[in-house]
């Protein structure tokens, strides 16, 4: 019988993959997930992403598909577009990009030609690979000029960016980051872009949920084009979007994504995006975003109380970035020690980091995922205390370190067992 396998459960068909999924579920539930680019999606988002839209190929856009049978695909994609525009107050949107990197590349393809000058934040100061970093296509195909932060404060130096813009005459300026925890002055970025005749791209991948909830400055009034992932603080499936208020730019982006960058869109992911956008439009999401920031601030306060240095001295978002140099500990050593005990974060470069990228002098923490789980300030203060205990133990004797490890394992288990 040809369809013999189609009705069987995963555990029967592929026990190895089933066991991997079961193991990952246990890992997520039993540990503290503090990677700033991660979150826990709702059951409804999971159901949409695991739906039969997986089966549907729908090259093109609603009303202009290259395949028949796209009636419901058109409806769900239009829902995603309408909800996204309502969420951010923009006029046009493309919900098809598979990732944030592809969204940024789609903007480059729409607005730039090879060799054009692009100004973006340097990787070690908090920028993203796609903001002109040398290993990325953005650094290979374009003349990438990187701005840094102030050495003393760790804050973006807008005067430096203006000087670079006047000197290099860019075609595109990128505002956004992957590890900059402070607010961004999108208005000043636009003023600089206008001064030199450049487009302004706001990459809000990390801040999107906070912006949607009104807890972080919005670039919609200022940016020519906005890109974002749909996971992270927006708490949707892994994917991306592109938004703009300019119809001419929107038309170019439509062509650059399809047929320029991608073929058939992932309709099951677009369905999940639509669900996530609907969730973000609810009043409860504003409360969630407020709690994200309260929790990250509580975490940062504990770090400072325990003598750790924070990049920029604090946070305005879901991110806290630690500078470990005063402890003579590397990010690599710290992150491995924490992971072993169920505290999951990532090693991270700090501004002007003397260490190599796979070693680093910093750690990055995010509060979005555990806030989704229900943790509040008191729990994040406890997390901060545990992190500090582990970092301090790395330079202690073996007996002290082992005692700390046993204590942290117990405390992590007690904390997570209350929020499964």
Swiss-Prot record:
**Where is the protein situated, by its record's location annotation?**
Cytoplasm
Question: Which cofactors are reported in the record for this sequence?
Answer: pyridoxal 5'-phosphate
- The keyword Zinc appears for this protein: no
Amino-acid positions noted as binding (6S)-5,6,7,8-tetrahydrofolate in the UniProt annotation, renumbered to this chain = 123, 127-129
Q: Which reaction does it catalyse?
A: (6R)-5,10-methylene-5,6,7,8-tetrahydrofolate + glycine + H2O = (6S)-5,6,7,8-tetrahydrofolate + L-serine
Q: Which residues cross the membrane?
A: none
* Presence of keyword S-adenosyl-L-methionine: no
Q: What does this protein do?
A: Catalyzes the reversible interconversion of serine and glycine with tetrahydrofolate (THF) serving as the one-carbon carrier. This reaction serves as the major source of one-carbon groups required for the biosynthesis of purines, thymidylate, methionine, and other important biomolecules. Also exhibits THF-independent aldolase activity toward beta-hydroxyamino acids, producing glycine and aldehydes, via a retro-aldol mechanism.
Report the sequence similarity comment from the record.
Belongs to the SHMT family.
Q: Which protein, by its recorded name, is this?
A: Serine hydroxymethyltransferase
Biological source species? Ehrlichia chaffeensis (strain ATCC CRL-10679 / Arkansas)
Taxon lineage: Bacteria, Pseudomonadati, Pseudomonadota, Alphaproteobacteria, Rickettsiales
């Amino acid at each position: 019988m040809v369809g013999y396998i189609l009705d069987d459960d995963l555990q029967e068909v592929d026990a190895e993959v089933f066991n991997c999924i079961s193991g990952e579920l246990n890992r997520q539930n039993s540990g503290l997930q503090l990677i700033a680019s991660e979150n826990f999606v709702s059951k409804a988002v999971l159901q949409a992403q695991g739906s039969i839209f997986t089966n549907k190929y729908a090259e093109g856009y609603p009303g202009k598909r290259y395949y028949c049978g796209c009636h419901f695909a058109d409806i769900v994609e239009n829902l995603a577009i309408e909800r996204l525009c309502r969420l951010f107050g923009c006029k046009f949107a493309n919900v098809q990009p598979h990732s944030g990197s592809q969204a940024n590349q789609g903007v480059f393809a729409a607005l730039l030609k090879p060799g054009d000058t692009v100004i973006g934040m340097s990787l070690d100061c908090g920028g993203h690979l796609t903001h002109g970093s040398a290993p990325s296509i953005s650094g290979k195909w374009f003349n990438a000029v990187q701005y840094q932060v102030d050495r003393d404060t760790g804050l973006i130096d807008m005067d430096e960016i203006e000087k670079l813009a006047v000197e290099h005459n860019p075609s595109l300026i990128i505002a956004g980051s992957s590890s900059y925890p402070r607010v961004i002055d999108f208005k000043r970025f636009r003023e600089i872009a206008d001064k030199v005749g450049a487009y302004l791209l706001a990459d809000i991948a990390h801040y999107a949920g906070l912006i949607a909830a009104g807890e972080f400055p919005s670039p919609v009034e200022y940016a020519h084009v906005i890109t974002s992932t749909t996971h992270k603080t927006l708490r949707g499936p892994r994917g991306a979007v592109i938004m703009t208020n300019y119809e001419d730019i929107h038309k170019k982006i439509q062509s650059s994504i399809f047929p320029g960058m991608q073929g058939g869109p992932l309709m099951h992911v677009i369905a999940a995006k639509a669900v996530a956008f609907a969730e973000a439009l609810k009043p409860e999401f504003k409360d969630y975003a407020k709690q994200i920031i309260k929790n990250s601030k509580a975490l940062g306060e504990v770090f400072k109380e325990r003598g750790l240095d924070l990049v920029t001295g604090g946070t305005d978002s879901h991110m806290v970035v630690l500078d470990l140099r005063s402890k003579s500990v590397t990010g690599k050593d710290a992150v491995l020690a924490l992971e072993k005990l169920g505290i999951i974060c990532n090693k991270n470069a700090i501004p002007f980091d003397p260490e190599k990228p796979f070693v680093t002098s910093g750690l990055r923490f995010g509060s979005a995922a555990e806030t989704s789980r229900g943790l509040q300030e008191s729990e994040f203060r406890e997390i901060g205390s545990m992190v500090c205990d582990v970092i301090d133990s790395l330079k202690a004797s073996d007996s002290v370190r082992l005692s700390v490890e046993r204590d942290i394992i117990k405390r992590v288990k007690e904390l997570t067992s209350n929020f499964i």
